[in-house]
Amino acid sequence: MESVQELIPLAKEMMTQKSRGKLVKLYVLGSVLAFFGVVLGLVETVCSPFTAASRLRDQEAAVAELRDACEQQSLHKQALIAEGKTQEATLCSRALSLRQHAS
């Protein structure tokens, strides 16, 4: 089919053949589905820059969230290490004071 103008005579010719009524319905169904495919393709082409920008924003937000979580985790680890050192220093000073009293 080179043009849309050939479709109408073809459809009329197919309708005149009574034995092929199912074939006409199938042909019309295929044409409608092809038309919807073309329309959806055009809509996707027009809207794709907007969806790409939103995906990029979502990805940047996810990266920032992960970065914040890693920073919080490292701060928590540093706090635990510092707390462990203070407890260790306290235990060490107690041990030294007990030794002085014992001798």
Swiss-Prot record:
Give the GO terms filed under biological process for this record.
Answer: extrinsic apoptotic signaling pathway; positive regulation of cold-induced thermogenesis; positive regulation of extrinsic apoptotic signaling pathway
User: Which keywords does UniProt give here?
Assistant: Apoptosis, Cell cycle, Mitochondrion
**Which InterPro entries does this one have?**
G0S2
Cell compartment(s), UniProt: Mitochondrion
Q: Please give the organism.
A: Rattus norvegicus
Which gene codes for it? G0s2
Can the keyword Cytoplasm be found in this entry's annotation? Answer: no
| Role | Promotes apoptosis by binding to BCL2, hence preventing the formation of protective BCL2-BAX heterodimers.
- Protein known as: G0/G1 switch protein 2
Self-association state and partner proteins as the record states: Directly interacts with BCL2; this interaction prevents the formation of the anti-apoptotic BAX-BCL2 complex.
Any one GO cellular component localisation term in the record: mitochondrion
